[in-house]
């Protein structure tokens, strides 16, 4: 009976420790990016590319930049200084990628 009780106590302690570890890791994972609000890239890029002569190309580049930077400058052109990450992304050829 004593062996059964000892085994049961050890299993209970092991279960509690495992559960605690899972909760700690879940709490750490939920804090990653805490305070960062994701913007609506589709809506922002639709407005940004509304006057583009090549809207599909503009939307593809804008969405790519938005997902990477979580920022799209206001207006249909310019204003890159308001979103430094967006303004710093370039193509392999060295040209600005983001519209």
UniProtKB/Swiss-Prot annotation:
| Family statement drawn from the similarity comment of this UniProt entry | Belongs to the GASA family.
Gene (UniProt): GASA3
User: Which protein is depicted?
Assistant: Gibberellin-regulated protein 3
Q: Where does the signal peptide begin and end? A: 1-26
Task: State its role.
Answer: Gibberellin-regulated protein that may function in hormonal controlled steps of development such as seed germination, flowering and seed maturation.
Its principal location?
A: secreted
A GO CC annotation given for this chain: extracellular region
Any Pfam family matching the protein = GASA
* InterPro entries for this protein: GASA
Subcellular location(s) of the protein: Secreted
Q: In which tissues is it expressed?
A: Expressed in siliques, dry seeds and vasculature of roots and rosette leaves.
Q: Which domain of life is it from?
A: Eukaryota
Q: How is it modified after translation?
A: Six disulfide bonds may be present.
Q: Which GO terms describe its biological process?
A: gibberellic acid mediated signaling pathway; response to gibberellin
What keywords is this UniProt entry annotated with? Disulfide bond, Gibberellin signaling pathway, Secreted, Signal
Query: From what organism does this protein derive?
Result: Arabidopsis thaliana
